[in-house]
Amino acid sequence: MPQSTIVKEEKQMVPRLTTALNGPLLSLEKSMLDGMPKIEHWFRTKWLDYSAPFYASVDLRNAGFKLAPVDTNLFPGGFNNLSAEFLPLSVQAAMVAVEKICPEAHRLLIIPENHTRNTYYLRNVVELANILRQAGMNVRIGSISPEITEPTILEAQGGMPLLLEPVVRVGNRLKLLNKDLGDFDSCAILLNNDLSAGIPDILKNLEQDLIPPLHAGWSTRRKSQHFAAYNKVAQEFSELLGIDEWLINPYFETCGEIDFHARTGEDCLALKVEQLLDKIKIKYAEYGVTQEPFVIVKADAGTYGMGIMTVKSPDDVRDLNRKARNKMAVVKEGLQVSEVIIQEGVYTFESVDDGVAEPVVYMMDHFVIGGFYRVHTERGMDENLNAPGSHFSPLAFQKPCTLPDCAGDPDAAPNRFYAYGVVARLALLAAAMELQEQDPLNS
């Protein structure tokens, strides 16, 4: 995840919603408040049919007239950005999540990303391990990086020490062999590594429970599969509440067989961009939105905000210069982009001081455990705020996403956060459906 600064305690605020056109959103938030018993009952019935991912984070965008998820991460890397006040929520949710997957588990091995230079990411691992330890687990951190050949203490952000131990495969189990601390044979393995570079042999065919499952990694997962599942969820939820599905659901298209270096697939991309922009214009006219429609073109597989661009015209993808093509051609781990998703762009009209803000909601099992705002002073309201090399300031949510004030204004802080929690849980449910559909054991 891109570098960030740690939450400052004096920032006890909620971003301003700087748009005059907030009628549709206030109506949506009011529908959620009025329908809260119905919504919570609906979620409970859904979780009887689907197993929630162990953990997830959802990036949302609030345009004042639309509130929608734009990305769902099944290997969240920002636990360091959550408010310490929500730790009890996290611990309770972690207890439930562990009990469901491995009820007898008391030892848990966390396998983080291989990179060890991002001190903020390392602090995320420290905080994640702390949550799980407080949930009653014996937790150690094991690395599958070839660079970690002996127990190594790294310094995480804030000077926090993090002990990484090399993982050893013994038969079909992963273990830590440590003369000083004793050997460690865990009941379950928690991946905080999104497998962008592929599934390493050391993780294949293990006896231990592996969470999330291997097919949740970006070597097999596709954003388009997720948003296809989200289409189904959003449609059913919108019928339940009697709202326009578009208010919570971004349109999307896909293009396969793209090669940005060779410039193959450009015509497909330009055509899909044009078609999507035309669809968005119709909805903008319906709701009186005067902003210019835009789409986001991004790699269908991958994370870290790489391989992403904002597009407002088909010509934007036909006239890419070499620098732009190079930027779009590869994602994390240097992998080539061959498939893209073209997603309706959702403006963010939330701001803090001089920065554009977008909410990120964190969940464990099917519980919302908190969240934060990415606040970016150098990007626009139509740009991706999660990008390599960018510096965003996390602003921890000061209110939980589970306790609306039904007597208050629809856009009062608890109610806005409740709406965030609802839409994030819709994306979580879509991820659960997606994982079930893509599970190789079900094929």
Task: List the model feature ranges, each with a label.
Residues 1, 5-12, 365-366, 375-443:
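Peripheral (often C-terminal) accessory segments that flank ATP-dependent C-N-forming ligase machineries
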